[in-house]
Every structure is written in structure tokens, then in C-alpha cells.
Amino acid sequence: SLDKNLLLFLLLLPSVFSLFGLWFVVKKIHSRSLISIITSRKKFDFKRFKFGFILWSLISISIFTLEILIHPDDYELNFNFLKFLILFLISIIMIPVQSILEELIFRGYLMQGFSVFFKDLYLIKKVKGEVVINIPFIRIMPLFTTSIIFGLLHILNPEIQKIGYGLLIYYVGTGLFFGIVTLMDEGVELSSGFHASNNLVASLLVTA
């Protein structure tokens, strides 16, 4: 079987190519700049990303530490310096790329795409003289749709197989939270920081 670190690297590697693929679709097919699906600001706000990353890391580590103190028997120390170093290098480089990619796809590209779709649906219904769906409903549909898709894409995760499909509620809820943050802040920088931190802490602390 493949080494776990090598397997992690191979699983994350497609994210790099997918990022270029997303750029190609946005730039060449939609004739838009990548920044247009990232933020309403002129450029990516790294301060927001950094703030989100640090805040979520502090919260996650605090909860994880508290969980260990309350249920110490549920955890086992499994530390190998060399393997951890390799894991750290892979994670610190690849996981932020993968997390930002997911935010760009779900909270950027798809959120905007579904907004256009549901807006057109609203206009069609209005023209035909049918019952008009109220605007707030139209606005939240892209949020719920992208969150459900985001949650379902985690259905093959190992923890789902062990704990059960009920855990999908957590992923859908996380998608909703990231989506709300994106809508309120008018950009994916904060949610990308939260997402990268969440995945990085899980990779380094839980699986290490």
C-alpha cells in the first residue's frame, strides 16, 4: 500500500491543475477575470485570509485540546518526527491550495452561477404571469444549493463510512456558514482562511 503522506500528496495534487482549469473556464469561456469570482475588492485581501486562518485555528485547537482533556482515552499519541515533517510540508503547501480552490468553486463560481440561474427563473415566471417567487427566496437559493452540493461531495470521506451519513449534516452546515461569511463579506478571503485552517488542523493534529 502507498505511504499515507504520498497518498495525501497524490490526492491533493489535482487541486493545483484544477485551479488552472478554473482560471481557464472563467477567463476564456466567460471572458471574466478570476478576481471577479473571488471578491468585490480590487485584489485578493490576504489580511482577511490571515485573520480567518488564525481565528479558526485558535478555535479549532482550543476545542481539540478541551476534547482531549475531557476524553483522553479516545485519543492515542502517534508521533514520528520524520513522517510528521513530511506531512507538515505537504499540508502547509497543498491544503491551502485545495481549500482556496473549493471556496472559489463553491462560494465563488457556483454561487454566482446559481444566482444568475435563479434570477432568470424568477424573470421567466414573472413574464409568464405565474406566482412570483419573492426576492429573498431567490437570494438564498444559491446559498443552499451550493452548500448541499458541497456536503454531498464529502460522502466518500473515510469518516462518513465510519460514523455514518448523519455527518453530512456537518458538512452542509459548514458550507452554509462559509457561504454566509462570503455573502456578508463580499469575498471568499475569510471563508478561505477558515477552510484552510480547518483542513490543516485536522491533517496535522488528528491524523498525525
Where in this protein do the model-derived segments appear?
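Membrane-embedded alpha-helical segments of transport systems
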Residues: 16-17, 58, 197-202
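Perimembrane helix-loop junctions in membrane proteins
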Residues: 30-34, 71-75, 106-107, 158-161
